Amino acid sequence: MIRSRRFFLALPVMLAADEAAAQLAAWYPLEGTDKSFFVELPGQPIYKIIDTTSPAGTPFAYHSYSLEYRRLSFVAQTALYPADVDVRQPKLNLQSALDDRAQRLAGGKWTQVDWKQVQGAPAVESIGPLGGGNGLRQLIVLKGHRYVSLGYMAPADAMRAPEAERFFRSLRLLS
């Protein structure tokens, strides 16, 4: 009888550990189709190619991976900027990306901006409010002509949720 009680007392702990392990195992390792980056997402994303042009009119493409997971949205994008995009002052390029995306924020401003390095490449991480009590967190990295961006949209109080932290910390530049 004592042995049965111990088993039933240990059962919730064993089930919780199994559930945590299953959640970890469910994360999807994503290597960009162009082999430029690696990131983990909590499921398999939808892949799209977004055609665009540089300010000088040279065509190029963004490779975009997006996932809706519960109340959370994850986006990873990369592009190889054409030669006519001047990347000699990467902070200006990163600031331009910040300014462009700030137009979509409630109030048109980021509430938090953190300039940093990711694997030696200039980067900026930012957080800002969206409508309806949601927020946007993004990380943009520019390594030479290689642009990599991670975006995370969720309720404003979930900007530092475990899923977000794992997503952002998993980024690795591969080329």
Where in this protein do the model-derived segments appear?
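Glycine-centered tight beta-turn/hairpin loop motif at sheet-sheet or coil-to-beta transitions
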Residues: 34-36, 69-71, 131-133, 145
